[in-house]
């Protein structure tokens, strides 16, 4: 492994960013100059060079002597300000090169065996090349080596007759020999023959024979290339006899022999060759090149290391000489026998073989003098080991300033060539190319800087042979490689539209661990096939192989993708332009393939010229070994010691079994069956992974099916391309047509449209024409996407590095996003179009150690030796620690301020228990499983209650039975689509799907149907609601929504900027008149700057990390500041400014204006325990052991406020005991709705019964009065209210009120009739965006409402006459994001009558305080909110209750301001001027209508539902008008009821919106999160601790990827970008075989966008 060393001169910015500090400071003696520099001397692995002496000569010619500290640091101050020169010696650490181990004892210990084997393999390779012999691995065993010869009809060429006869003579001798000999011969057939055979591809039989005989004497298997170097040395000596007089040539021959000696032989060879070649030239460049070559062996003090190697030279030289003597004797014996018998050697080789033996004799004769020569060169070289650096000093104090502007960079004179431009062809990269010569070289781990120049040693082994012919050929072959399967654009079920081939991807096995193991398989109906572990048609990721031919290696991966490489020399690597994600390197003689994700693949088992995958490793050293025996995979060894037994028949896997360390079976992972042709017929791999297959004689997949309802059939043309699909339930009824001359394919979809694809000769899609004519164009360079042009002409360009990673993205608006990587493809920095940068420094394993955002905040990470995350430290000082079991599973989580969590697993790595160490005792949750299922059959909760789960054969959840015995049922159809759900009350809902198995509607329990229709491109075109009203949608050719037409004819028309972001919404009434335009403006980074609507202009400003620092609405600004941890700490611009203090992620203090701060204390579990201000107000919270709120009380005053909560075993609220309002008890039905409420207050008792229909609509409310004995009985119930509903679930009549709705389902009339009174009617008017804009009251008053671009109400104005000059004529509202932060009431003359500010608990809608300003006076009241976040009390700063309120269940709100005129008791409310308009979370009371404004809608407490339909449609649940099903537990702060999208809170795990089975058989999941932080945190947990890419939780996002290739990466933060669901702001995920989106709720900014978003999930 390369461990390059470098000296870095740190700029001030580098020093600050990397947190470097040292007490090792030396004065240069020039205080007048006062300049400084910070030296950081380290290896490329990141390890420091400790205690290294140095001399620095500054611009004053002053010599400054010093030594680095233990961290490789030293600061020089008061030095000359110009250029300086720095010379550094070696450090105090040790140089420890890897030692090779002897592992070839059978042949080495028996010269006769070695000689026999050498001649045997030479003949075998020569004859195999002529097609005359073939090794039969199937019939070979420890007792027999089986080789098949030419058939009786094959003529043996005359020149090969003696060779052929001699081979069979040797074959008999081997098979008559010992068992150990036959084992060794079989081993060589599979382990050594491939590269030696490839080297012998030039028909040089003499060289091949020489090498094969020598091979038998080599102690270290795997050194085949070193063997060849001995033979090649002899061949060169034969061709140029004069070279035998050159001491350098003789010395190189001696070193070739030393290199194969176990132990330090290889290190001596590498060092010796580098030294003598460098000293021969003698230039500083060559000397430094040699230093860097030797440095590739190890970190450490090179002088001490070379001294130790020099001392070993004589010992290893003697062993090598003895080895040469044995080889020489064997060669002489073979030659002597051949002369006597006039055999094949004489006929094929003539004099060349004899001459090579003569060259070897001369080497042996001069061997001792060669050792002396090498030793003298070691002595000469050791004195020249030094590192030189030149650079410029920094001004005084620079290092202490993190924001110092960049100065002139330090220039590193490393005596090597300056870095060259990275190569993009197949050439081998060497050290003097300026790039690491080892694909796993430990690269720069720190944030790159123009001011930091490294001295880096490569790992090249000196002069290299000319690879030009191979490079040319490899380039030609790689240029013919087709586009990879990851570029597949599929249609149907599924078909690759570039080729027309049916393709299929499946994952059969997934095992977690230190390095997770998966077995994935791939099928395609046409193209070249390569039989593998699953037979003739399917290929697995374990089938990855290298095919060698004349110095070229062709990689074929598990999906038949190919890449062509030149075989690299030792210490170098080569690239394949068409697959830049791979690099092929040679390390210690072995070929190693490295992927950009950091995984390394080794190939040590040979099948002829094919090398099979033998190991997978990560950067942390975790390794999966694949053990082969004579072409059959037998075992897979996992990093934790467990094994997978691979049972095969005819080299095909028939069973995979997980075994423990002692090879005892634990679990059958999968089993396979085949037909006589080797075609895979069935797979049994556990729930959801069981399939049966049928094929045509040509191997075309005709049908596959699972064990449930899903099947797919294909028809083909003569070329194996799909013509038509047929599937269960008629999904994907597509047809395919091809125009080969035009490289064009057509897909006729089930929607009636035709999608056309045009490809290039390499199967890259150049054009995709949608059914509506829109054309997407793509440009490719070496199979890498270089640009794409959308149908509107917007061009996006991609720049890439040598790894194929995108380094710059230029969007259609010209903005550029930049990504910086180190030499191994690890992200170092991201820079947004405004120049803000996020930096990442990494450890030797490539894992992020520090992530820093543009605001200077840093997150620090520590890891175990296995590369698992062990600790995270945030910029606020919070630390979270992780501990793992031996299998790499999380065993203990210590989340800083919260209790530790311990996890337990069974032998199948399934979670079985979780212990949380609460202060009330350990809380235990358990999971039980049935058989081998990975999904739990039962969960036992902390209180002992249980929930049971049932599944079908495909692993779909079919039933849930809760602790009360209530059962929920689920039924599925083809492709695991959910068809029916039945709740415990028997209500059944049915779901419908379109032609491509996407959700297309629902039939509710009452038979009403909500339907979606789609256009020819598969886009939602029509939405038909329960009542028959229809919304229609139109799109442009780029797939962007351009128009929504409502049932009444009103329209919303959408416009987009060049970047695809929503830029304008035009609202038009049914008569065509415009209601005005809403416009959106963005900055270069895509962040919203301005949203202007007819009623409001909203403007935003951001800090460098992208956090909002200013929100201005109609000129009124709310300013936000953040602390070091990124938490909101200051809010200004409101009535009273807010100051927030945080500790460990918890709110600890809150200051409101100049009032005494509130302080907060928390339980060990993180729940709020107490809040107080030190002046009398103190609110205490009590929590159950399972985290349920059990009580609230005001401390210090008995009885003034105490509230307690009771729950059932399902944690549902069943009772409230309130010191003021009395006691409440609730009874719930199977749907979780309250069916009975009993209240007791003193001696007063009453009860109510609630009746619902199957759609959970409240139909009837009955009251129960106590009988004479005070008892409450249901038989005494009397109906109070009954409601009538229409087919859409809207209330049409309730009591004496009638309700009418318009064509869009919005309330337009509320008419109340009372006997003896004139009917009272309230009229409601709406705009095209479904916003209530005007109310006309029965008394003639009219109120008009205004909104901003996001649907937030910003004003309420009374139109016409007002009753008095003191009456409120206008109300203005203030917003802080989605929180209604206040309102100001104005009189007719514009004077303020009352201003209110509401303060909420951070990140929620739970009110915390109310600030009022009236008549110049400001007063503060603290709000006490109940379980659901409803304001219940207003308390003064001294703790007195001044107001009480209670929201009735399905009824009106009641309040108490001042119960008696004179305050007598502290518990009595006082001061009738104090009141609170807040209701349920997110709601504010409108006195004029009695409605509650609820952000996106208006809630009518009398109806218990909203007065307009949910703007997000069915995404809000099956009751578009309904409020939550149980307001005693659930809230809807956004007015998007029931909708998992908008129920508050979403929770840290988000809410799953949709789960489907993709056409490839993988699961696709879309989830909604509150914001990107929550989404990232959730994703980080899913990916596990072994992530190699990550971003901090407060800045821009790039992505994470773990060791298995699972990933989470940023989609976009903009609106209207992408196609389909990808148009909405999201992250992308690919985790555990599940792909999908993580949508961000806070980026969906207005009602129109909610409509669009909702429609995407219908």
UniProtKB/Swiss-Prot annotation:
Biased composition (Low complexity): 400-413
InterPro entries: DUF6531 (IPR045351), RHS (IPR001826), Rhs_assc_core (IPR022385), RHS_repeat (IPR031325), RhsC-like_FIX (IPR049802), T6SS_VgrG/RHS (IPR050708), YD (IPR006530)
Key words of the record: Hydrolase, Nuclease, Repeat, Toxin, Virulence
GO molecular function: nuclease activity; toxin activity
Top-level EC class: hydrolase
Composition bias, Basic and acidic residues: 473-490
Gene ablation phenotype (knockout): A double rhsC-rhsIC deletion is not outcompeted by wild-type cells.
Stretches the record annotates as Disordered: 393-494
YD repeat placement: 821-857, 939-966, 1014-1050, 1326-1355
Domain of life according to the entry: Bacteria
Entry keyword Signal: no
Enzyme Commission code(s) on record: 3.1.-.-
NCBIfam families referenced in this protein's UniProt entry, alphabetically: Rhs_assc_core, YD_repeat_2x
Role according to the record: Putative toxic component of a toxin-immunity protein module, which may function as a cellular contact-dependent growth inhibition (CDI) system. Expression of the C-terminus (residues 1519-1658) in E.coli inhibits growth but does not alter nucleoid structure. Its effect is blocked by cognate immunity protein RhsIC.
Sequence similarity: Belongs to the RHS/WapA nuclease family.
Protein name as it appears in the record: Putative deoxyribonuclease RhsC
Organism: Dickeya dadantii (strain 3937)
Gene name tied to this protein: rhsC
